[in-house]
Amino acid sequence: TVSSYSARVNDFRNMRMERWGTMDKQQEFALRTVEERDVRFIRLWFTDVLGTLKSVAIAPAELEAAFEEGLGFDGSAVEGLTRVSEDDMIVKPDPSTFQILPWRGGPQGTARMFCDVLTPDGEPSLGDPRHVLKQALSKAKEKGFTFYVHPEIEFYLFERQDDWSQTPTPIDEGGYF
């Protein structure tokens, strides 16, 4: 019946709220927003040492575990992270970077978070540009400096084409400079 279904949904929500007691407010906000906005995928973003954006998509049901444990991936496939002999790596989402992606239309959206790259024992990867930046900011702070840093995400727009063997045609002739 409808009332028993509603009771089960409320029990599930209460159980989740009890578990959220151990989470920080940013994790709680991300989980609540994913549920309220009917987000279907969360993209976990990180970069290689060359600054190339990498993305792993997870379902909302996987987000809580990703906050707690991270998500494993093959680090040897990412430029500059590891050698093949030490390929297991973990991405752990930073809930302070949670954002609904605005270009995904329709009732169900997609969100993204930037991630830290960790070794299997939970230590920051020395090949993670985000970790290198955090170290540099920490050293600068020790010397009395404060920096404000944000990612610069760039893209190009091309005309739609059905034949992918052709060279892409830019939408405009504007240049970078």
For the regions a language model picked out, list residue spans one by one.
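Short, Lys/Arg-enriched N-terminal segments with co-localized hydrophobic residues
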Residues: 1-22
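Glycine-rich, acidic/polar active-site loops that bind/position phosphate-bearing ligands
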Residues: 20-177
